[in-house]
Amino acid sequence: MIISMVIIFIVQTITQFLLHYFAFKYRGEKGKKALFYADNNTLEAIWTIIPVIVLAGLIIYGLFTWTSIMNINEDDDPMVIELYAQQFNWKARYSGQDNVLGMANVRLIDLDRANILGLDEADPNAQDDVITTELHLVVGRPVHFKMRSQDVLHSAYMPHFRAQMNCVPGMVTEFGFTPTVTTEQMRATPEMVEKVQRINKIRVEKSEALVAKGESALDTYTFDYLLLCNKICGKSHYNMQMKIIVETQEEFDAWMKEQKEFKNSLN
């Protein structure tokens, strides 16, 4: 990104200077006639070839960057998690001990059976899947996200991880990354401590006015990583928020033991 910005800034500075310089130099004046200049093959070749080379370089560099982001190396043993979007909430589905997600289809949703994501009950890989309303990640372990949407176009947006991918009805989209800072570590950084203090100071001031009106005070703000929807998906779009907890392997294992596997969650 820095390389692209530097190149764009240099080219923009030069071209904007020339644009304004020549507009001034060759401004209309009384008694001056315009010169008709039909063409110049050399100039046309220069201003065609140079942009082609620069743009091709940026595109090729971008493709390598995109590939490094989108290609998940299976040798790194990434944790496979499905992010399931629907109006107006998120669900996370963990792939269980086998690290393989079971087959699923919205046509298989059966609320009476508590099969809320439409998992194939006959698929052996689905039996140990775990469905949650919080997203817990292990620090330092790669994650392979697969995304589905039940209804309309949503967008899985994790601003703190600079990651975003559309959730498209009828197809599975995916990306991966490795979280490197736990939630507790992020909360302890000087920048975050200062930000939280500033936010809570404002909340205290606002709460005084609310309490004076007989209303409840605002809750104290605590930092959490968040999964948001970045597509306006309906009137309750704002409610599409899921807490993300980045923690140690031991903390994750303890949390996972408290969750029900799919086979044990059906009615």
Enumerate the language-model features and the residues they cover.
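Non-transmembrane, membrane-proximal soluble domains of secreted or membrane proteins
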Residues: 1, 23-267
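Membrane-embedded alpha-helical segments of integral membrane proteins
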Residues: 1-28
